[in-house]
């Protein structure tokens, strides 16, 4: 922001003089030498260059989306309570409170809203923002805020001493401030048009909180609880309650504790009363919604069975579908039991090593048996009987040819046997005839 600007500075024509040494035309000057000569001159542009650009944006922006600043009347009621409200806070403004409110108003988006710069005002045309929007924006905003605070303090003094009926005086003062800001607040954009979900609770709108709780510092926990408690509620416009008294400091402290203790698990427990009222007495003409059941996380085992490509192919026939399903389920259960038995990664590593060792032993035994069977087959073939280095393919081919030759010889011998049997029968009959003739 510009240097040498304060709330007591009323001569806005001299604002440019304070920053005039920063700007120069084509004249070459030694600014650092001037600074050494004159102690009253502000620092050079290179030393304090970023402070020149800390100005408020001139064009008006949209209203703030924060829950504490979305409704200006609520903020006014919470911050300017009657003088007798010792519990609610804010009777006589201290210097710290005034500085905090002014800083919040100037730091947020509310300076650029229509309730500060009213276009219907006659002084708006002669405003110094229009005359010089580059250097006098902060001064004009400070002037407007100070005038607004002075008018509120004068209105509070006119109300007189507080009566014993503190609630009535609170309502009258709040209604007075709301009447002052109601036409300006109506010009703001309705947050329900921008947000699909309402910022307040769906069951009943809460009264505006005091500045100690959440008026100027809205927490993300409250927004989270409101959006998660009613995610399917229809968007409703924010309603300004004129007769709602400000809450006490004890209520605000309890609300702060509730908001600080919010976590992911207890978000759904924030609105028990609203859910009870909806379940007991639903409004007429509306359909009752089923209660949202909380999500339950269940543990499930993902089967990661891999095929052993090193194992020999199975020569047995395929099992039926039912038997195959039983075998698969048995494998899954066995894997689950094995996973449960593995208590630590060290034990799982030892089990894997044992399985690998047993697999290697079985594979070695299988290869040795296959080699012995080939050697036995080679010994049965006459051509390869003495050839110890005969490959397995030659052994198989010679064995096949030898088997075929042996089978052919077998058939030949069987036919010869049949002929000999017939010859025997004939000889027996002939011998019997000779015996009968001799007798």
Curated annotation (Swiss-Prot):
Chain residue ranges for the region called Leucine-zipper: 413-434
Motif (9aaTAD) on chain: 100-108
CDD domains: bHLHzip_c-Myc (cd11458)
Composition bias type Basic and acidic residues, residue spans: 266-278, 315-331
Highest rank taxon of the organism: Eukaryota
Extent of motif UBR5-degron: 355-364
Gene Ontology biological process terms, A to Z: chromatin remodeling; chromosome organization; DNA damage response; G1/S transition of mitotic cell cycle; intracellular iron ion homeostasis; MAPK cascade; negative regulation of cell division; negative regulation of monocyte differentiation
Modified residues (Phosphoserine): 6, 62, 71, 81, 151, 293, 314, 329, 344, 347-348
GO molecular function, one term: protein-containing complex binding
Record region (Disordered): 201-360
Compositional bias (Polar residues): 335-347
Glycosylation site list: 58
Cross-link (Glycyl lysine isopeptide (Lys-Gly) (interchain with G-Cter in SUMO2)): 52, 143, 148, 298
Protein name: Myc proto-oncogene protein
Organism of derivation: Marmota monax (Woodchuck)
């Amino acid at each position: 922001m510009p240097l040498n600007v304060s709330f007591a500075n009323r001569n806005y024509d001299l604002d440019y003089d304070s920053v005039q040494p920063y700007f120069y035309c084509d004249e070459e000057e030694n600014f650092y030498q001037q600074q050494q000569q004159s102690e009253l001159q502000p620092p050079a542009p290179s030393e304090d260059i970023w402070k020149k650009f800390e100005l408020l944006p001139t064009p008006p922006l949209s209203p703030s989306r924060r829950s504490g600043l979305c409704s200006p009347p609520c903020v006014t009621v919470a911050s300017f309570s009657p003088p007798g409200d010792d519990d609610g806070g804010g009777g006589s403004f201290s210097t710290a409170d005034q500085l905090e409110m002014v800083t919040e108003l100037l730091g947020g988006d509310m300076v650029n809203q229509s309730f500060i710069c009213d276009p219907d005002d006659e002084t708006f045309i002669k405003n110094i923002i229009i005359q010089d929007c580059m250097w006098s924006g902060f001064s004009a905003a400070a002037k407007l805020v100070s005038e607004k605070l002075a008018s509120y303090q004068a209105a509070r003094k006119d109300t007189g001493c507080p009566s014993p009926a503190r609630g009535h005086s609170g309502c009258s003062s709040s209604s007075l401030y709301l009447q002052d800001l109601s036409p300006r607040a109506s010009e703001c954009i309705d947050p329900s048009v921008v947000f699909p979900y309402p910022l307040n609770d769906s069951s009943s709108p809460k009264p505006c909180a005091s500045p100690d709780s959440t008026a100027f510092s809205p927490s993300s926990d409250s927004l989270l609880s409101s959006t998660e408690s009613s995610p399917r509620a229809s968007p409703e416009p924010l309603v300004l309650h004129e007769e709602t008294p400000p809450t006490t400091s004890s209520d605000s402290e309890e609300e702060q504790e509730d908001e600080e203790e919010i976590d992911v698990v207890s978000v759904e427990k924030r609105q028990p009363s609203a859910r009870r009222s909806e379940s007991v007495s639903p409004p007429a003409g509306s359909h009752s919604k089923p209660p949202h059941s909380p999500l339950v996380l269940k543990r499930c085992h993902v089967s990661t069975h891999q095929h052993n490509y090193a194992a020999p192919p199975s020569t047995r026939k395929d099992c039926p579908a039912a038997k195959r399903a039983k075998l698969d389920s048995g494998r899954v259960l066995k894997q689950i039991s094995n996973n449960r038995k593995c208590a630590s990664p060290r034990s799982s590593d030892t089990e894997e090593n044992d399985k690998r060792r047993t697999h290697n032993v079985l594979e070695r035994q299988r290869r040795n048996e296959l080699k012995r069977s080939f050697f036995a087959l080679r010994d049965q073939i006459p051509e390869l009987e003495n050839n110890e280095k005969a490959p397995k393919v030659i052994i198989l081919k010679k064995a096949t040819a030898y088997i075929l030759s042996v089978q052919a010889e077998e058939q030949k011998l069987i036919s010869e046997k049949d002929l000999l049997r017939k010859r025997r029968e004939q000889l027996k009959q002939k011998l019997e005839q000779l015996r009968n003739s001799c007798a």
